[in-house]
Amino acid sequence: MIATAQKLIPLYNNNEVKGSIPCNRKEKIDTSGGRIHISHVTEPSLTIYRPANINKTRSAVIVCPGGSYINLSMTHEGYDVAKELNKYGITAFVLKYRLPNDSCMQSKEIGPLQDIQQAIILVKTHAKEWGIDSSKLGVLGFSAGGHLVSTSLTHFNTCYADNPLDISVRPAFGVLIYPVISFQEEIAHAFSRGNLLGKKPAQEKMDLFSNEKQVTPQTPPCFLVHAEDDKTVPVKNSIRFYEALVDNKIKAEMLIYQSGGHGFGLVNPSTKETWMDKVILWLQLNGFYQPDK
């Protein structure tokens, strides 16, 4: 099953974003190396990838590329992933989210979270039109995009987006690929932390956005992927989050590769197996996906 032509839609009507500040930043697109990297995002959007056939699985995933909260790796952590999900009959939405910036946001640590919550609201609002079951809408993120996903999985009780219909912003499940999870000094990815919270954040704020500390019995089920030799984001980020999930009796599975480093996207070069196949089996096990036979 292949993807249909994608469609890009603005995340907000007329780009009217609560808590935003008018600024002169212009979006930058870098295509060097054959991949698209976007920075200075001020007009967030969703790019919809729908399966070629009617989405009989009715499953959907919002994909959040990584980039240390300073840019977005849109190709190998976004568009390529959406196309792969389409092969399984899953509708995918690649989220181009705003990156933290004091000149454009009243609270820069809230901007990305507000965008993923708005994306969830938007998809659920159009669920019938797009052939989606809202109870099968999950989130998937890489690196700093994994931090954003883990934040959406643990901070859903407060909605920062306009939500007049009081639509739940709790994802059904989360898939986290070499994610930034913790902002605690010993395992933090300092660059992502600094971009989101500033150079010298208070311990209270670091704790709030160290999402292993925010897991509760209401946190959605999760699948984690990491490489043991990741020198950029230590594997203990995933391990601590997994332990918190287990402590709270949340359904969870974790795949730790012996090697592979950081930023490998869909394919870990150290192995012929793919983590996506394992994710699909896990989704099926937990009732979030039924193959289109």
Where do the protein language model's features map onto the residues?
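N-terminal cap/lid segment of alpha/beta-hydrolase-fold proteins
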Residues: 6-55
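Mobile cap/lid helix-loop segments that gate and shape the active-site cleft of serine hydrolases
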Residues: 28-33, 179-214, 220
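Short beta-strand element of the alpha/beta-hydrolase
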Residues: 57-66
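Catalytic nucleophile-loop/oxyanion-hole region of alpha/beta-hydrolase
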Residues: 72-78, 97-134, 268-274
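Short amphipathic alpha-helix adjacent to the substrate-entry channel of hydrolases
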Residues: 74-93
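Primarily recognizes the serine-hydrolase "nucleophile elbow" in alpha/beta-hydrolase
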Residues: 118-188, 206
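Short beta-strand/loop motif that positions the catalytic acidic residue
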Residues: 224-226, 230
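C-terminal catalytic histidine-bearing segment of alpha/beta-hydrolase fold enzymes
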Residues: 235, 239-293
